[in-house]
A protein has these predicted regions:
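Primarily recognizes the serine-hydrolase "nucleophile elbow" in alpha/beta-hydrolase
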Residues: 24-81
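Conserved alpha/beta-hydrolase "acid-adjacent" motif
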Residues: 94-101
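Short beta-strand/loop motif that positions the catalytic acidic residue
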Residues: 86-89
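Short, conserved catalytic or adaptor-binding loops enriched in Gly and charged residues
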Residues: 102-110
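Extracytoplasmic/secreted proteins, especially bacterial periplasmic and envelope-associated proteins
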Residues: 17, 21-24, 51-52, 132, ...
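Catalytic histidine-centered segment of alpha/beta-hydrolase-like enzymes
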Residues: 119-132
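Alpha/beta-hydrolase-fold serine-hydrolase catalytic core, especially in secreted/extracellular enzymes
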Residues: 142-172
Length: 172
C-alpha cells in the first residue's frame, strides 16, 4: 500500500519502467511517422497499467492530454495539469484503492474528472473480462473520446447491453 509521505513504496521501479516503455515506443513511432501529433497522447491502462498511465502523465504533461484508467489503485490522479481524465472504478472488495488516489467529489467536479462507479469486479475490467463488461465500458469510452462535455458523461447502464449482436467478423 502506498503510504502518505512514502509514495510508491515497492512500486516506483515498475512505474519508471512503464514510463520508459511508453517513451521508447513513442520514440519508435516518431521515426516511423514523423509528422504525427505526439503532444496530445491518450494513455489508457487497467490496474497497474492505469497507475503507469497516471504516473507518466504526471511526469510528462507536455505529451499527455487524456488519461483513461480502469480501476488503478496506487498512483494519485493528476490534479495540477489540465488533463481530461476518465476512470472506471470497480466494486470489488478484494481490490481497494489506496487513500489519496481518487480526488474528492468536489475536486473531481472542479477539474472535470469523470469517475464512473461500476458494479464490475476488478479483473473483469481487463481485456480478459466478459464481453458484456467490455461493451458497457466501450460505450462510455466512446462518449468520452468524442470530446463531449464531461458534465454530460454518466455511468453506463450495466444492466442493459447497447450492442447485443456485432455481426460476423472482421470488425473495423
Amino acid at each position: 500500500m502506498t503510504k502518505i509521505g512514502l509514495p510508491y513504496v515497492g512500486r516506483l521501479q515498475v512505474y519508471e519502467r512503464g514510463e520508459a516503455n511508453i517513451l521508447f515506443v513513442l520514440g519508435q513511432l516518431k521515426e516511423l511517422q514523423p509528422n504525427a501529433d505526439y503532444s496530445h497522447l491518450t494513455l489508457v491502462g487497467h490496474s497497474n497499467g492505469g497507475d503507469i498511465s497516471m504516473f507518466c502523465a504526471k511526469r510528462h504533461p507536455e505529451l499527455v492530454s487524456k488519461v483513461i484508467t480502469l480501476d488503478n489503485l496506487r498512483v494519485p490522479f493528476v490534479l495540477d495539469h489540465k488533463l481530461k481524465i476518465l476512470s472506471f472504478r470497480s466494486k470489488d472488495p478484494n481490490f481497494k484503492t489506496d487513500p489519496g488516489v481518487l480526488p474528492t467529489p468536489q475536486q473531481a467536479k472542479a477539474d472535470d474528472i469523470d469517475i464512473v462507479n461500476t458494479k464490475f469486479q476488478h479483473t473483469d475490467m481487463s481485456d480478459r473480462g466478459p464481453d458484456a463488461v467490455k461493451e458497457t465500458i466501450q460505450a462510455t469510452l466512446d462518449h468520452f473520446l468524442s470530446d463531449s462535455a464531461s458534465s454530460e458523461l454518466a455511468p453506463a447502464n450495466t444492466d442493459k447491453l447497447i450492442v447485443t449482436n456485432l455481426g460476423p467478423p472482421p470488425y473495423p
